[in-house]
């Protein structure tokens, strides 16, 4: 159970990872360098190197995940939302108990969330076709 208003750490939260993965490299590096990689449990990413690898995988998949990295038995899948400048400005996600939101379904769920994120992004002026940028392929 997550208490209302709970703030997840940047290195554990799928919505944060979804945005960070698509930030410009300079801003991304500043944020990554500022993180204290606190261990919450055995699933937590605890090194900068592992976190950077996770962000690279996020870009490759088009969605970010949280595999019970802060709260045991809680998974999350998230996709970024972009503005007209191709900047990630928000995320959309689904969170659930790990027995119901299982890794085998992450690709399917990521695709569904990605479709919604693309619709929202387009409403904000995001036009990936004009410059070859797309997180939702």
Segments (PLM) and residue ranges:
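Extended hydrophobic
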Residues: 44-117, 135-137
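Generic alpha-helical structural context detector
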Residues: 17-21, 56, 118, 122
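Cysteine/selenocysteine-centered motifs that mediate thiol-based redox chemistry or coordinate metal-sulfur cofactors
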Residues: 30-31, 35-36, 117-137
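Generic secondary-structure transition motif, activating predominantly at the C-termini of alpha-helices
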Residues: 23, 35-36, 55, 59
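Intrinsically disordered, low-complexity segments enriched in polar/charged residues with Gly/Pro
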Residues: 6-7, 37, 65-68
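Intrinsically disordered, low-complexity polar/acidic regions
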Residues: 40-41
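Amphipathic alpha-helical effector-binding/dimerization core
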Residues: 1-34
